[in-house]
């Protein structure tokens, strides 16, 4: 194998490693985003429920007052 072929092979191997690394990093970032989005959704639901409970309590208190 000539030097240019060896250089081409080394270059392709370097690029393959870089692409594999980029794919792994992208996958890890996407997985983290899915988890973060799920936690955010759960938190939003909990806050909504708490807000509704507070509003219900306030309405009940107003009804008792008048």
Curated annotation (Swiss-Prot):
| Protein's job | Major structure protein of the hrp pilus, which is a component of the type III secretion system (T3SS, Hrp secretion system) required for effector protein delivery, parasitism, and pathogenicity. The hrp pilus functions as a conduit for protein delivery into the host cell.
Q: Which domain of life is it from?
A: Bacteria
Name the chain's protein. Hrp pili protein HrpA
The UniProt family comment states:
Belongs to the HrpA type 2 family.
Where in or outside the cell it occurs: the entry states: Secreted; Fimbrium
Region annotation Disordered: where it falls in the sequence: 46-66
- Which spans of this chain does the record mark as coiled coil? none
């Amino acid at each position: 194998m000539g030097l240019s072929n060896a250089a081409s092979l080394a270059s392709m191997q370097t690029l393959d490693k870089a692409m594999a690394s980029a794919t792994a990093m992208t996958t890890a970032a996407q997985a983290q985003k899915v988890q973060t989005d799920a936690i955010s959704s759960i938190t939003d639901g909990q806050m909504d429920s708490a807000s509704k409970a507070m509003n219900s309590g306030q309405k009940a208190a107003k009804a008792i007052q008048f």
